[in-house]
A protein has these predicted regions:
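Catalytic helix-loop patch of NAD(P)-dependent Rossmann-fold dehydrogenases
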Residues: 1-40, 44-55, 63
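Alpha-helical structural signal
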Residues: 36, 54, 58, 129-132, ...
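C-terminal substrate-binding subdomain of Rossmann-fold SDR/epimerase-dehydratase oxidoreductases
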Residues: 63-261
Length: 261
């Protein structure tokens, strides 16, 4: 079953995948649908109000470190680049501390949602771009399903037929002679997972944060586990290049450089 808090988003994605699959099976088109895991990388969204888990966590830890160091110049630079609830670097120190505390950011301490136990998979965004180009240039739908001729029209169905879609005389995508053809999308990821707590520790290491990372178990964890099976993509000749520890360090370096821009 779909995870309740994510159901609408999941259904929208699944609908797109099935649409590509159905067009291919009915009309012999060559749409390739890729399903990425959680992405991170340059130009990520670091706004605390609506950011993804990794950039949000990274910024929180970074700001907690700056507060401890009493580095108000760096704090103001950060907030001028990305204000929090309208509070930028021109605000009074107390006002800045108040708004940051709403997001669990304090002097050398960060509070994060949940237990830290959920497992997540992360893919460097430039690896995602590379995988997409690889699939575009090297993969056809027939490579995915292992059948050269697969459209119901090719097998004699009428595109305006009135019969049941599972009939050879019908108009649907299903072709009884070929059996069931489904799950034709390609997962794009690393096939490796990490707990949210381990991710926080990796980020703390990259930021050189020595403070306290706390988890608020009264807040929701979300889906317990999100891991893609990337066997299909690996067999089609592509594998990720950037591992999570290197990626976290690269993302923080990008963030620091972006603050200087």
């Amino acid at each position: 079953p779909l995870e309740y808090t994510n159901e609408e988003y999941a259904l929208a994605k699944i609908s797109g995948l099935k649409m590509c699959e159905s067009y291919n099976l009915q009309y012999g088109t060559n749409y390739i649908a890729v399903m990425p895991t959680n992405l991170y990388g340059p130009n990520d969204n670091f706004h605390l109000e609506n950011s993804h888990v990794m950039p949000a966590m990274m910024r929180k830890i970074y700001l907690a470190k700056l507060i401890n160091e009493d580095n108000w110049q760096a704090i103001r630079t950060d907030l001028n680049k990305r204000p929090v609830e309208g509070v930028d670097g021109t605000a009074q120190e107390q006002r800045i501390l108040e708004v940051l505390s709403k997001y669990g950011i304090a002097d050398n301490a960060v509070q994060l949602w949940g237990t830290g136990k959920p497992l997540r998979e992360f893919l460097w965004s430039e690896d995602m771009a590379d995988a997409s180009v690889h699939v575009l240039l090297n993969v056809d739908f027939s490579d995915i399903i292992g059948i050269e001729k697969y459209s119901s029209v090719f097998y004699g169905a009428e595109t305006n037929g009135q019969n049941d879609r599972n009939s050879n005389a019908g108009r649907g995508g299903a072709i009884p002679a070929l059996g069931e053809i489904r799950n034709c999308h390609i997962n794009v990821g690393t096939g490796k997972e990490i707990t949210i707590k381990q991710l926080a520790q990796l980020i703390a290491q990259a930021v050189d944060f020595k403070g306290d990372i706390q988890f608020d178990s009264t807040k929701p964890d979300g889906t317990p586990r999100k891991l893609t099976d990337v066997t299909k993509l690996n067999n089609l000749g592509w594998k990720h290049k950037v591992e999570i520890d290197d990626g976290v360090a690269k993302l923080f370096a990008w963030y620091q450089n972006d603050l200087k821009a």
